Amino acid sequence: MFDLDAYLARIGICDRPGLASVHRAHVISIPFENLDPRRGIPVSLELADLERKLVYQRRGGYCFEQNLLLKAALEALGHDVELLLARVRLGRPPDSPRPRTHLVLRVRADGAVWHADVGFGRGTLLEPIPFGPGGPHEQSGWRFRVVEDGPELVLQTAQNGEWIELYGFVPEPVPFIDVETSNWFTCTHPRSPFVTGLIVSAVRGDATRVSLSDWEGLALSEDNPAGGTVTPVQPAEVGRLIATRFGLEGFNG
């Protein structure tokens, strides 16, 4: 059985909160990271394993882990949650689509339907947004919108005066077995960026995003809606940065 009290303590909440409060607290409290796939360790999506890793061991995880943990919490709070699989569009030309390897949630709460996602790393939503086309939605200075592109709904974010595509998805729920298959590909395929690269991200209380990644050269980035900085990092610094900037001890990247 899911330990809701332990989860709420992990994200710093002591009462029975609403959807937006849970979502924002989760994003701020639990880092995004791929340290297990990076080290050749497959990712388990069993709820007990998610609780052990993200709640009790105070680790982070990537989209499947993050959003399945959020799903369990929201269901324990009485909300209806459906699973959706998305194709990441960020950094990808339109004629070269990626597989559906990103998990998104559709949540029914407070008499409305919401698009929830705590698992997109440095570009993730801070709070749920109304499900379907619409926006812009401003969240602590970050701006998001959803547009239609054929059968897909596409989440975009504003950067430097332009709308950047993050991911697209067909708004049809999928069974858990599809999520397991997508997760297995993501954490074990030799060409998966989560196997070959490093990404650790966190959102601060002031909505600043901090990321350590080697996807485009090993660097530490700090971003806020007004701009950001990128600082090159030496490999010998990785373990210290993972511990001091993201609260994850005992890892060397």
Question: Where in the sequence are the language-model features?
Answer:
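Mixed-charge, low-complexity segments
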Residues: 1-60, 65, 75-99, 120-253
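Short beta-strand scaffold segments in enzyme catalytic cores
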Residues: 103-106
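Beta-strand scaffold of nucleotide-dependent catalytic cores
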Residues: 116-118
